[in-house]
From Swiss-Prot:
Regions of compositional bias (Pro residues) in chain numbering: 869-880
PTM note: Phosphorylated on tyrosine residues upon activation, e.g. upon integrin signaling. Tyr-397 is the major autophosphorylation site, but other kinases can also phosphorylate this residue. Phosphorylation at Tyr-397 promotes interaction with SRC and SRC family members, leading to phosphorylation at Tyr-576, Tyr-577 and at additional tyrosine residues. FGR promotes phosphorylation at Tyr-397 and Tyr-576. FER promotes phosphorylation at Tyr-577, Tyr-861 and Tyr-925, even when cells are not adherent. Tyr-397, Tyr-576 and Ser-722 are phosphorylated only when cells are adherent. Sumoylated; this enhances autophosphorylation.
UniProt topology in membrane: Peripheral membrane protein
Record location of the Glycyl lysine isopeptide (Lys-Gly) (interchain with G-Cter in SUMO) cross-link: 152
Region of interest (Interaction with ARHGEF28), residue spans: 912-1052
UniProt GO BP: angiogenesis; axonogenesis; blood vessel development; cell migration; cellular response to transforming growth factor beta stimulus; central nervous system neuron axonogenesis; endothelial cell migration; ephrin receptor signaling pathway
Sequence segments annotated as region (Interaction with TGFB1I1): 707-1052
Compositional bias ranges of the Basic and acidic residues kind: 685-697, 837-849
Family recorded in the similarity comment: Belongs to the protein kinase superfamily. Tyr protein kinase family. FAK subfamily.
E.C. numbers: 2.7.10.2
Class of this enzyme: transferase
Protein name from the UniProt record: Focal adhesion kinase 1
Length: 1052
């Protein structure tokens, strides 16, 4: 049998200086005749099924067995004896099954004389099936998949248009289930998913033309959706076995039948059936039971020849053990007799575990006189190669290239580097195939160029070597300032890829280490640079397929480069690339990539959106704590990654566009590049403005002290301007107008004087509005926000009082210490003080509207504007002053506190009455207080509590509310009838609030350990807060009714 190997240069012409190496390490002799054979097969790849093929190089002595052996070896097949080799003429029904001992060159010369080579199709097929073949094939996945694809192809070509509509629907839906086994059972309910299947993949791949033509599109869609749901829980293997189960009653794919006659003349016309269960049997009429002739283990010899009559029919003779005379079968032609002989011989070899043929015949052209040479061990092969051999012997090889991943070796002239010029340094990382080292390239142009060297641990295997070098093939086609450059390759073992070195390492690690030193402008700059690289790839029709922060390298503090092109693919003439196998980054992938393994520039856009999110989150991975299998379900439920803290809403809006479920609605990289450029420029302008404001504030604080030794006064509480801090908290009215579109509630920044000037993107819902500030303290505003002329005069006054240097230094140090103390004091006070702006139901809804719950199918975190200033908030009380029930000061606003881990500070409440009434025996008042205390207790325990403890806590609140409402029902009859309606409305509102709390609790339990868990906890607190506020409102309504009643009974 011919030795076979893989040569990556097969489909490309190497340069004259390039050595062509065999996969086994043996060099080809010059002048050796070689021919190329294209063999079609059913090993699944990313291309269309009709194009699945391998390109084979063969020499004069290569036999059919050698070609079969190499193809199946490359796919790690166990049941090699089941495979046969078929030659078909495309313009007629002429079919020849080629025996494994036939020489390929002789076969080609024989048949290509009759018809041109392009009219012949060489095909690898499974022909010989063992008993219980499905059970055996389940342990040999490549063979099971091969046989399934073969049977499915035969079914679609031969009988699909004749089968019942229900069977055709089931078989088609099983193929959809098998092909896209990671797709959820209800995925086809989504219009965009069905359209991908219908328009991009094509329904004709799954269903016969007769079905598609006879059923209306809308009806067909419903039928497919209903049928697909029946198989929603099947995996790939179960789908295949179910397919065979449904198909076998209408199509016997496990046997072959031949019309012939028993005996040497046409006496008994029969249909000979040959298969694993029947052995050799015949049927005289359709529908009758087969008559058994012989088992394969009884066959001793097989002979065939032309008959002696003028019709030249084919004669087949089988010598059966125990039979008095040979079994003679007359076939319509010699070709059919040969095909029958090959089939029976294959079954005999399979059953007996033999390699020797059972066919006895005279030597003919195209056949070998001796059986194939058995396969030798590697050591024996190497030993043989040391001997002098003739040219014809060195040509005895078969060479295979899978068209799926054809690789072109970079030419020696341009990219081959001598290993002596590389100094290998320390290991700086680990790649998919091996370690990555730092090193030095000693080139004539640059004597000591720092480089990164990718090594391959197991590149002795041709397939691993090919896949490893695929990245170099891809990278050499790119030249962009934000894409890592290929410097060269070393193709001799050990194989190395040499690339430019990015000294600061992976972007994800860089972001984590520099989390507190990188400003927002730098993060947006990185995203913009990546968008330029990806726009470049898009223009060259490449899909990257693995865009993530871990695959971006940092060249300098202001330059990042896209790397790791191991998964990149050129899309050729199609608009998408389909991956057939391999590990893929599920949590970064677009839904169509997860469901259909479909990769396009639009799917790269989705991944880029996730990568931008990683950058803004300083290296946090997406969907932390979620299993890969659960990601697609969450995406299809409308879940999206939440808005990162301090992220400009315009940038988050751009991310959400990248995450549109429908690929056609996502922007292109050219659009992303332009929009990111605009966002980057806006951020730079805002950054410069904040720096000017900070400088002006520091100068004002420093100069205003003049020659006085008095320290600056302590700033007022959060939400109340002081003379010193007003300029830091509030930009000028012109600046306020410019920056309103960057204000987002729910993301408070750090507090205190040093951070005040930098609060452009921070939540400002608790701060007084600029116009209200003027209304509150016009004198202070006029005093501490002078005009430009006044500012200049003030500056001159401050500069005029010059202090000795040592006194100035001491004063500045003291002021700095006091400012730090003020900062700590502010942070401490803010935990207990929240302005009243959060107490109205309307402001709660507006502030926490950054996530409005499930709306439609999209759970997207929506940025909101500042609160409506139509009703100015009231001034909160001083710290320690007697509280009022309406303040509910012990309940922190969920929108702010949840960003600090929901650290709520429950306090004892002793609320004074809202009206001058006797509370000694006021059950309504007591129960309202009890309800508020239950809410406070729940709020304090919700953060560390596991999901199973949510129900008891909410139940306590519900019991307190039920007691309150029962008490109100007892109180209503004693109150004026005119007030009953208002009281009942307040009761209904409380019931609605409890329902909202229970709804949010269920969502928090459902999305435990996901990115939405914290958000739904926050919404639970918001609902509980609303319940407490409305309970107090109910008390106010009842108090008003009591006062009205007292006024009616009072004597006039």
């Amino acid at each position: 049998m011919a030795a076979a190997y893989l040569d990556p240069n097969l489909n490309h012409t190497p340069s004259s200086s390039t050595k062509t190496h065999l996969g086994t390490g043996m060099e080809r002799s010059p002048g050796a005749m070689e021919r190329v054979l294209k063999v079609f097969h059913y090993f699944e790849s990313s291309s269309e099924p009709t194009t699945w093929a391998s390109i084979i190089r063969h020499g004069d002595a290569t036999d059919v067995r050698g070609i079969i052996q190499k193809i199946v070896d490359s796919h790690k097949v166990k049941h090699v004896a089941c495979y046969g080799f078929r030659l078909s003429h495309l313009r007629s029904e002429e079919v020849h099954w080629l025996h494994v001992d036939m020489g390929v060159s002789s076969v080609r010369e024989k048949y290509e004389l009759a018809h041109p080579p392009e009219e012949w199709k060489y095909e690898l097929r499974i022909r010989y099936l063992p008993k219980g073949f499905l059970n055996q094939f389940t342990e040999d996945k490549p063979t099971l998949n091969f046989f399934y694809q073969q049977v499915k192809s035969d079914y679609m070509q031969e009988i699909a248009d004749q089968v019942d509509q229900e069977i055709a629907l089931k078989l088609g839906c099983l193929e959809i289930r098998r092909s896209y086994w990671e797709m959820r059972g209800n995925a086809l309910e989504k219009k965009s998913n069905y359209e991908v299947l219908e328009k991009d993949v094509g329904l004709k791949r799954f269903f016969p033309k007769s079905l598609l033509d006879s059923v209306k599109a809308k009806t067909l869609r419903k039928l497919i959706q209903q049928t697909f749901r029946q198989f929603a829980n099947l995996n790939r293997e179960e789908s295949i076995l179910k397919f065979f189960e449904i198909l076998s009653p209408v199509y016997r794919f496990d046997k072959e039948c031949f019309k012939c006659a028993l005996g040497s003349s046409w006496i008994i016309s029969v249909e000979l059936a040959i298969g694993p269960e029947e052995g050799i049997s015949y049927l005289t009429d359709k529908g009758c039971n087969p008559t058994h002739l012989a088992d394969f283990n009884q066959v001793q010899t097989i002979q065939y020849s032309n008959s002696e009559d003028k019709d030249r029919k084919g004669m087949l003779q089988l010598k059966i053990a125990g039979a008095p005379e040979p079994l003679t079968v007359t076939a319509p032609s010699l070709t059919i007799a040969e095909n029958m002989a090959d089939l029976i011989d294959g079954y005999c070899r399979l059953v007996n575990g033999a390699t020797q043929s059972f066919i006895i015949r005279p030597q003919k052209e195209g056949e070998r006189a001796l059986p194939s040479i058995p396969k030798l061990a590697n050591s024996e092969k190497q030993g043989m190669r040391t001997h002098a051999v003739s040219v014809s012997e060195t040509d005895d090889y078969a060479e295979i290239i899978d068209e799926e991943d054809t690789y072109t070796m970079p030419s020696t002239r341009d990219y081959e580097i001598q290993r002596e010029r590389i100094e290998l340094g320390r290991c700086i990382g680990e790649g998919q195939f091996g370690d990555v080292h730092q090193g030095v390239y000693l080139s004539p142009e640059n004597p000591a160029l720092a480089v990164a060297i990718k090594t391959c641990k197991n590149c002795t295997s041709d397939s691993v070597r090919e896949k490893f070098l695929q990245e170099a093939l891809t990278m050499r086609q790119f030249d962009h300032p934000h894409i890592v450059k290929l410097i060269g390759v070393i193709t001799e073992n050990p194989v190395w890829i040499i690339m430019e070195l990015c000294t600061l390492g992976e972007l994800r690690s860089f972001l984590q280490v520099r989390k507190y030193s990188l400003d927002l402008a730098s993060l947006i700059l990185y995203a913009y640079q990546l968008s330029t690289a990806l726009a470049y790839l898009e223009s060259k029709r490449f899909v990257h397929r693995d865009i993530a922060a871990r695959n971006v390298l940092v060249s300098s503090n202001d330059c990042v480069k896209l790397g790791d092109f191991g998964l990149s693919r050129y899309m050729e003439d199609s608009t998408y690339y389909k991956a057939s196998k391999g590990k893929l980054p599920i949590k970064w992938m677009a839904p169509e990539s997860i469901n259909f393994r479909r990769f396009t520039s639009a799917s790269d856009v989705w991944m880029f959106g996730v990568c931008m999110w990683e950058i803004l989150m300083h290296g946090v991975k997406p969907f932390q704590g979620v299993k890969n299998n659960d990601v697609i379900g969450r995406i299809e439920n409308g879940e999206r990654l939440p808005m990162p803290p301090n992220c400009p809403p315009t940038l988050y809006s751009l991310m959400t566009k990248c995450w549109a479920y429908d690929p056609s609605r996502r922007p292109r990289f050219t659009e992303l590049k332009a929009q990111l450029s605009t966002i980057l420029e806006e951020e730079k302008v805002q950054q410069e403005e904040r720096m000017r404001m900070e400088s002006r504030r520091q100068a004002t604080v420093s100069w205003d002290s003049g020659g006085s030794d008095e320290a600056p006064p302590k700033p007022s509480r959060p939400g109340y301007p002081s003379p010193r801090s007003s300029e830091g908290f509030y930009p000028s009215p012109q600046h306020m107008v410019q920056t309103n579109h960057y204000q987002v509630s729910g993301y408070p920044g750090s507090h205190g004087i040093p951070a005040m000037a930098g609060s452009i993107y921070q939540g400002q819902a608790s701060l007084l509005d600029q116009t209200e500030l003027w209304n509150h303290r016009p004198q202070e505003m006029s005093m501490w926000q002078p005009s430009v002329e006044d500012s200049a005069a003030l500056d001159l006054r401050g500069m005029g009082q010059v202090l000795p240097p040592h006194l100035m230094e001491e004063r500045l140090i003291r002021q700095q210490q006091e400012m730090e103390e003020d900062q700590r004091w502010l942070e401490k006070e803010e935990r207990f003080l929240k302005p009243d702006v959060r107490l109205s139901r309307g402001s709660i809804d507006r502030e926490d509207g950054s996530f409005q719950g499930p709306t439609g199918n999209q759970h997207i975190y929506q940025p909101v504007g500042k609160p409506d200033p139509a009703a100015p908030p009231k001034k909160p009380p001083r710290p320690g002053a007697p509280g009022h029930l309406s303040n509910l000061s012990s309940i922190s606003s969920p929108a702010d506190s949840y960003n600090e881990g929901v650290k709520l500070q429950p306090q004892e409440i002793s609320p004074p009455p809202t009206a001058n009434l006797d509370r000694s025996n006021d059950k309504v008042y007591e129960n309202v207080t009890g309800l508020v205390k239950a809410v406070i207790e729940m709020s304090s325990k919700i953060q560390p509590a596991p999901p199973e403890e949510y129900v008891p806590m909410v139940k306590e609140v519900g019991l307190a509310l039920r007691t309150l409402l029962a008490t109100v029902d007892e109180t209503i009859p004693a109150l004026p009838a005119s007030t009953h309606r208002e009281i009942e409305m307040a009761q209904k509102l409380l019931n609605s609030d409890l329902g909202e709390l229970i709804s949010k609790m269920k969502l928090a339990q459902q999305y435990v350990m996901t990115s939405l868990q914290q958000e739904y906890k926050k919404q639970m607190l918001t609902a509980a807060h609303a319940l407490a506020v409305d309970a107090k409102n109910l008390l106010d309504v009842i108090d008003q009714a009591r006062l009205k009643m007292l006024g009616q009974t009072r004597p006039h």
